[in-house]
């Protein structure tokens, strides 16, 4: 068997998430169906580095799969790209070692979250940015977001009832920029891993801080108390993008 690593992007609007599901459309299943056709009907299993939720997009998701033969990477990329649905793009494919695993190999992830604060909202962006038409103090949010950097127990920012026991993660970058029109905010988070709904919960909290309904110090309090009830609401999934996954050499 020959193992291939692929970088893909997808529009998450019409998917119930990356992971295969029994009664809903998923990115994993669509790619497996295409690979199975290319493999003359013999089933191929796809593994993903991250499990994006329903409605979440990806600019640089990484997958791997095994084929019973070796083929030129660009020919394989072209075939997989052109025969996959239009809301999936295959950016690159490369041969990797047989023991490479896209999920367990040491890596970092970068996510972006886009907020549209336009009045009125832009209907063309409704599936690709979360609308928040209320007053926001960007400077307050820029101060608060920096308090998320570093190694912390992020229990207070994960979904209640998550089965993951170790909730300590390291965020190497947490930043917020505003585009030149002032309408779109981009939150960026890079780190060694993120908990279930962690980024959406952090963004929901930051928006509440920006709207002066929480103090800047709330971030430190949530990290200290590890209490989800102290954080803001979960931001909608449509603004979230898995931007990039980087593997250590």
From Swiss-Prot:
Pfam families: PseudoU_synth_1 (PF01416). It catalyses: uridine(38/39/40) in tRNA = pseudouridine(38/39/40) in tRNA. Substrate binds at residue 111. It comes from the Bacteria. Keywords: Isomerase, tRNA processing. One of its GO terms (molecular function) is RNA binding. The active site is at 53 (nucleophile). GO terms for biological process: tRNA pseudouridine synthesis. It is an enzyme of class 5 (isomerase). Its EC number is 5.4.99.12. The keyword Isomerase applies. HAMAP family: TruA. Homodimer. Formation of pseudouridine at positions 38, 39 and 40 in the anticodon stem and loop of transfer RNAs. Belongs to the tRNA pseudouridine synthase TruA family. This is tRNA pseudouridine synthase A. It comes from Streptococcus pneumoniae (strain P1031). The gene is truA.
